[in-house]
Each structure stands twice: as structure tokens, then as C-alpha cells.
Regions:
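Cytoplasmic helix-loop-helix junction between adjacent transmembrane helices
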Residues: 113-157
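A membrane-interface helix-boundary motif in multi-pass transporters
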Residues: 106-107, 172-186, 255-259, 370-389
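A late C-terminal transmembrane helix in Major Facilitator Superfamily
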Residues: 344-375
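Helix-loop boundary and gating motifs at the non-cytosolic
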Residues: 2-63, 214-265
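Helix-to-loop junctions at the C-terminal end of transmembrane segments
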Residues: 64-78, 172, 274-288, 372-373
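C-terminal transmembrane helical hairpin of 12-TM major facilitator-type secondary transporters
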Residues: 289-333
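C-terminal ends and interior cores of transmembrane alpha-helices
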Residues: 87-104, 298-310
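Intracellular juxtamembrane helix-capping segments at the cytosolic ends
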Residues: 122-138, 245, 328-341
Length: 419
């Protein structure tokens, strides 16, 4: 009952239903567009290697330019940036589809359109997480709901990575990959525009005495670069898991290894969702950095457990148990970003988190792909993923480390001691 009351409290925050529902609809493209783009380009060229280049250009362009969009949003507000990118991104995808009708000769244009599409992907995650920080600020009267709100955001966001590929598969089944790409463009346009025109984004106002980013922006904020190391460790592990689990399934499946891999990854996601919902109703720890370090250490240990699982059933049980640490860790990650980054740099800070997560995930997947090709590679790849998270845990665990000091400073600013 208490748990339900807390989540109902989040739902009743003005503008919250819009963020929760249309925020997920607008971000379905994160799970749809890369796969649909890969399939479209492969159909044109007949080669997955060329299609993968288009996907890489799309991802790198988005990772490189999203912090710029975040900085602009911090200065003028998120609504104008979201509206502009909500239109520009679908137009770039349509341009890519038109170019794909011209065959191999249009490959440079396809690559260009992929880059533009990636660069213009709406910074919706950053805007939404920044909005939750504003809605549950220390002076809002809802500060006690911040942990629950960010846990709900983190847990619901995982739907994107489950539902997105399923929607692409459905479009391909009834039509083709081009229809899937159009579908991704439509949900991005509708969801982002709706959020941008909602009362939360339109009601954005600059915070008094806020510090706008200059130069390296939040990268110069004490504690934030160290937090990005933790983000990178998680990204490497998640990217690696996307390669390791299918490789494990291929080694152990008696039937279709692709279906088995999908089930195992889905089970991992279910474990994360359960953990996230449970964590959202817990009282926030007085020392979030220490709690973050403990969760990262626990997650790192689960990869060592995965490495010794003898069969898919055992791995599935381990995944659902180990997955329970993921959403809580990501919730604390988002909470610490909101605490450490100045309000005038919040959107940019969250876009840096997304950028580092995407880049490190790609790196983790690439390294894991090399490792699993060797004898006993699946086991070593799991250990590699766990080691990446362990590095982040070590950084967060430093008692007088940069993250801990930054959190202490933020807590003192939120709750000043009367003189």
C-alpha cells in the first residue's frame, strides 16, 4: 500500500502523466531506429558491413552533438530544442529512405542522412530527467518523491529496449524495414512534440543565480567526470552483454539460438524492472555515493556468477536475480547527476551521460565480440564486463573521492545549516 501511494504521488505531480507516457512513446525510436536503419541499408546494399557503417555514423553523430543540444536547452529552455529536433529528425529519416530508393550509388547520401538523423535526435531523456529534478526539487514540497520519480523513469525507460525491436519485427512482418523506419519517425515526432508542448517543458524558467555552461561545461564540475567513469563502466558492461548473451545462447541452444538470446536478455530486463520498482519506494540513503558503489560492486559480482553458469536455465535464474541491481544503480546515477550538476547545466550534464553510455556501450560490444571468438571466450567476456563495472565501483567507493565530496557539497547546499 505504501509503495502504491508513493507511485500515485508521482503520478499526481502536475505534468507527470505526460512525462511518463509520452516520454516513453517519444523515445521508442531509441530501440527502433538503429535496427530499422540497419535493415533498410542492408536491403539496399546486400551487405551488413555497409549497413553497420550507417548505424555507426548515426550513433556517433548523436553522441557527438547531443551535449551541444543540451547546452542550448539549458539556455533557452528544453521546449524549443525538442520541437526543432522533433521535426528535423524525422525529415532526415525520410531523406534516408528516399536516398535508399536510388540503390548503391546513393550510399554517400545515405551515410550523410544517417549522420544528420543521429545529430538531430531529440535530447528527450535529458530534458525529462532534468524536469523530474525540477518537479521534485528541495523547495517543491515533493523532494521526498524524487527517488520514486527517478526510479519510475529509469524502469519505464527499459521498455524502450524491449518494445522497440519488437515493433520493428512487427513492421517487417506485415510490411518492410522502410515501414519500420517511418514508424520510428512517427513515434519520435508525436511523443517529442507532445512532451515539448506540455506544461512542464513550456513552464520551464531559468533558475535564479544559476551558472550557465562555458567551455567544457559540466565536465569541469567537481565529481562529474568521476561519475562519467562509472557511467562508462556500466555502458561497457551493457554493450558487452548484448554480444555475450547471444554467444552463450549459440553455444548452448538446442533450438533457435536467437530466440533463446532474446528470452535471456528479456529475463535480465524483468529482473531490473522488479529491482527498480522496489528501489523506488525505499527511503533514500543518507550517503547515495556509498550506496551507488555497493550496487555497482554487486552488479560486477553478478557478471562473475554469469561466467560460471553451465546452461541457459541456470543463466536465466542468475540474470533475473542479478538484473535486480541494474535499475537501482541507474536511478542513483541519475540522482547523483541531478545533485552534482548545477541547475544551469543540467540538460547538458544528462546529455553527457547519454553520450558516454552510448560510446562505451559500442566499445564494450566491440571488445566482447573479439573475446567471444576465442576458446572459452564467453566466460572471459563476462569477466571483462564485470571488471568494467568494478572499476566504476572502485571510483565511487573512494571515501574522500570526487563523487563523495561533490555529493557532500550538494547536500549542504540543499539543506544549509542555520547560523
Amino acid at each position: 500500500v505504501t509503495a502504491l501511494r508513493q507511485y500515485l504521488g508521482v503520478w499526481r505531480i502536475p505534468g507527470a502523466p505526460m512525462l511518463l507516457i509520452f516520454g516513453i512513446i517519444g523515445r521508442l525510436g531509441i530501440g527502433m531506429t538503429p535496427l530499422a536503419l540497419l535493415l533498410v541499408v542492408e536491403q539496399v546494399t546486400g551487405r551488413y558491413s555497409l549497413a553497420a557503417i550507417a548505424g555507426g555514423i548515426y550513433a556517433l553523430a548523436g553522441a557527438a552533438l547531443s551535449p551541444i543540444a543540451g547546452r542550448i536547452a539549458d539556455r533557452v529552455g528544453p521546449s524549443p530544442v525538442l520541437l526543432l529536433t522533433a521535426v528535423a529528425h524525422p525529415l532526415a529519416l525520410i531523406g534516408l529512405l528516399l536516398a535508399s530508393r536510388s540503390g548503391d550509388d546513393a550510399l554517400p547520401v545515405i551515410y550523410l542522412a544517417a549522420g544528420v538523423a543521429g545529430a538531430t535526435y531529440p535530447p528527450l531523456s535529458a530534458a525529462i530527467r532534468g524536469a523530474w529534478n525540477d518537479l521534485t526539487g528541495p523547495n517543491s514540497g515533493r523532494y521526498h518523491l524524487r527517488n520514486t520519480a527517478l526510479a519510475a523513469e529509469t524502469t519505464l525507460f527499459e521498455i524502450v529496449f524491449v518494445l522497440g525491436p519488437l515493433l520493428v519485427a512487427g513492421f517487417v512482418l506485415v510490411a518492410d524495414a522502410a515501414a519500420a523506419l517511418i514508424g520510428a519517425a512517427v513515434v519520435t515526432l508525436v511523443g517529442t512534440t507532445t512532451v515539448a508542448l506540455g506544461q512542464v517543458m513550456r513552464g520551464w524558467r531559468p533558475h535564479p543565480q544559476e551558472h550557465h555552461a562555458r567551455g567544457l561545461g559540466p565536465l569541469r564540475v567537481a565529481g562529474f567526470p568521476a561519475l562519467l567513469i562509472c557511467v562508462a563502466g556500466l555502458g561497457i558492461a551493457f554493450g558487452a552483454a548484448g554480444v555475450i548473451v547471444p554467444a552463450f545462447a549459440s553455444d548452448h541452444a538446442t533450438g533457435d539460438p536467437e530466440s533463446l538470446a532474446g528470452v535471456l536478455l528479456a529475463v535480465w530486463g524483468i529482473g531490473s524492472a522488479i529491482g527498480g520498482l522496489w528501489f523506488g519506494v525505499r527511503k533514500p540513503a543518507p550517503n547515495m555515493t556509498r550506496q551507488f558503489a555497493l550496487l555497482l560492486a554487486a552488479l560486477a559480482a553478478t557478471f562473475a556468477v554469469f561466467a560460471v553458469m553451465p546452461n541457459p536455465l541456470a543463466l536465466g535464474v542468475a540474470l533475473i536475480a542479478g538484473g535486480a541491481t541494474i535499475a537501482p544503480a541507474l536511478t542513483l546515477e541519475n540522482t547523483l547527476v541531478g545533485r552534482i550538476a548545477p541547475t544551469g547545466m543540467l540538460n547538458e550534464a544528462y546529455t553527457w551521460v547519454v553520450t558516454v553510455a552510448v560510446a562505451s556501450s559500442a566499445a564494450g560490444g566491440s571488445v566482447a565480440g573479439v573475446i567471444v571468438d576465442h576458446a572459452g571466450g564467453v566466460r572471459w567476456a563476462f569477466l571483462f564486463a564485470g571488471a568494467a563495472v568494478a572499476v566504476g565501483a572502485a571510483v565511487a567507493a573512494l571515501p574522500a573521492g570526487p563523487i563523495a565530496r561533490a555529493e557532500t557539497t550538494a547536500v549542504r547546499a540543499e539543506h544549509p545549516v542555520p547560523v
